[in-house]
Amino acid sequence: IQLDLPEVIRYGKEKGVGLSLYVNGGVLKPYGDHDVELVWKTLAGWGVPALKPGFVACSSQEDIQWLRNLVALAAKHKLVLNIHDGYIADGMRRTYPNLLTQEGGGGRETRPPVTHELMLPFTRHLVGAHDHTPTLYSGQDGRTKLYEMAQLVIYHGARQSVRNVYGSRNQFGEELEFLESVPTVWDAVRVLKAEPGDCVVIARRNGSRWFIGGMNDEDARTVK
């Protein structure tokens, strides 16, 4: 596929839409042939504000040092990053706030069990922001539409890469309306119910608006 990225970026800006690009980390040096800084500089020059490096190596000290350089060079060129795959937050964002979030927790595309997703707020989220790549509405794996939407409130992270497994966004109504209205940063948080692996209900406030999200396992329960 031949894609004129500068033209796509220009068209998006014309419509008031920014572009976040997925970049396969395997093509970047030393794992691939392309120089990281040259790629970042080129994309920034085209007007790309955000990147999502994926398939990144993160299992050794050398890998993490490479990731730190990746983030540092992105900061130099004023690029926001969301690191995909297995890297778990380790405090790097304190130095480089352009690292908005990262996956590192078995994202939704892996179709994890509900018990896994109900443990994340008590485990993975303790170390930093998390992009779970939630599905806007799949109706799969015994999950309901509201369960999927609640992740946008419960999971901590200023960027959630919401997936649409069925294609056209025009077929969604209230899901899309909620997605467009839910904030990405919060002023206050209250935990209303918390049973690791079973259920979690959290209220978050942005300005004067409160949002409440609840996720539950297969057992019915009433929360007051």
Segments from the language model and where they lie:
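Extracellular glycoside hydrolase catalytic/binding regions
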Residues: 101-110, 183-190, 195-196
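Aromatic- and carboxylate-enriched substrate-binding clefts and catalytic-loop regions
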Residues: 1-144
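Catalytic cores of secreted or luminal carbohydrate-active enzymes
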Residues: 150-192
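Hydrophobic, well-ordered secondary-structure elements that form the walls
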Residues: 81, 154, 212
